[in-house]
Amino acid sequence: CSAHEPCHEHEKQVEFDIAPAGVISYETALPVVFEQLKKAAKDPFEVIARTMSVNPSRTIKIDNAIKEGNEANLFAFDPDREWVHSIDEARSNAKNSPYEGNKMKGKVLLTFAAGKKVFAE
């Protein structure tokens, strides 16, 4: 497994040094980053927007600005929403998460990609 593809569980159930790299983090990345930035940054939302959206868009030369004529690529995030991460409820085919059973704060509630709603809680 590579290129951000999920690994089968049996591929991860081996010694650490021979297991394929990576863990699922699609649903946990933003809450984890937000919690850390709340402690370290004056404006955590600005840092997240810049480092997880604006800069990557520039790197791959995509105009991802929210403006008339552009397709929506955005999400709604509730920074106060508390939830417990469960790999059984995760939307990934992979089943390896270091956050299994952890109480999380902050949750993505809605996502649009290329102008289409692709996720809604």
Task: Map each language-model feature to its residues.
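C-terminal cap of metal-dependent C-N hydrolases
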Residues: 15, 68-121
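His/Asp/Glu-enriched, well-ordered alpha-helical/loop segment
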Residues: 2-79
